[in-house]
């Protein structure tokens, strides 16, 4: 088997090794495709070197095929297509005992804190697996993880049909949030300065606006008939969006924090009092979000094919990262880890 190891300084080594036989409760996968995530790009830029052990095999947006099953594992057979929910929770802390394993107090994120998926063979705990139905191929399967992020965001927002949602930021996650929001019957507006990303939103069938040349608050006021947005998703991670989110939310609107802000941004707390706003955090996903994401793909409600910008072999992972780094128009780059599949 081969694995791509991040070695720092925007560099990878592809090394040959041995597949790890599954222990009790584990399954070994032949990895199909792995998506390059925004978090992977942060690692690539060295932002997370203090957290990520170097060298490390990163990657967590993965589809694959069951190759070997460990003792005690039930419900899976060799040859089945699966995806991995890349969270390793302790099961013992108060948060896990409350059923919130995705925000476990001792959570390890696979592909960041522990070895990840940019390898041809990956052995994981069976509890992290979700099956793919026959109609969902491995390329689409590699996007189940980011789609699950969007499903969790929308589920946290309590968004319903007929409501109006504004998404601040039209990157891959923002566009997936737009797609999920549209699937529940909401009217959707994506605020994004990048021309190609606004075009992508338009092709998804949602509205878009450039906040750099349009007064966003005035635009939303007109779009909603002065009511304001029912839900605002902050997906950009930039300060202007933080300033806008409280302005454009309507009375008793819900604001969902999706982006990670590295420094504490100033927030207009007066608007929370004046409008009775809600601020909701949304971190990763739960099992139900993976199930929902798979159903959205299998039912045809969301087509993920337009999100795939490129596919590269594992041997060319360095070029795949470099190309994504220089392509702000790109959505999702996939790395193919077993070309024969």
UniProtKB/Swiss-Prot annotation:
UniProt xrefs under PROSITE patterns: ADH_ZINC
One Gene Ontology molecular-function label: zinc ion binding
UniProtKB keywords: Carbohydrate metabolism, Metal-binding, NAD, Oxidoreductase, Zinc
Enzyme class: oxidoreductase
Co-factor binding details: Binds 2 Zn(2+) ions per subunit.
Coiled coil ranges: none
Annotated residues for binding of Zn(2+) 1: 37, 60-61
Assigned EC number: 1.1.1.389
Binding site for Zn(2+) 2: 90, 93, 96, 104
Gene3D superfamilies listed in its UniProt record: Medium-chain alcohol dehydrogenases, catalytic domain, NAD(P)-binding Rossmann-like Domain
Catalytic activity: 2-dehydro-3-deoxy-L-galactonate + NAD(+) = 3-deoxy-D-glycero-2,5-hexodiulosonate + NADH + H(+)
Pfam families the record matches: ADH_N, ADH_zinc_N
Top-level taxonomic group: Bacteria
Keyword Oxidoreductase attached: yes
Site (Important for catalytic activity for the proton relay mechanism but does not participate directly in the coordination of zinc atom): 145
UniProt key word Hydrolase: no
Active-site residues, Swiss-Prot/TrEMBL: 39, 42
Cofactor(s), by name: Zn(2+)
Family (UniProt): Belongs to the zinc-containing alcohol dehydrogenase family.
Physiological role: Involved in the degradation of 3,6-anhydro-L-galactose, which is the major monomeric sugar of red macroalgae. Catalyzes the third step of the pathway, the NAD(+)-dependent oxidation of 2-dehydro-3-deoxy-L-galactonate (L-KDGal) to 3-deoxy-D-glycero-2,5-hexodiulosonate (L-DDGal).
UniProt-recorded name of the protein: 2-dehydro-3-deoxy-L-galactonate 5-dehydrogenase
Organism lineage: Bacteria, Pseudomonadati, Pseudomonadota, Gammaproteobacteria, Alteromonadales
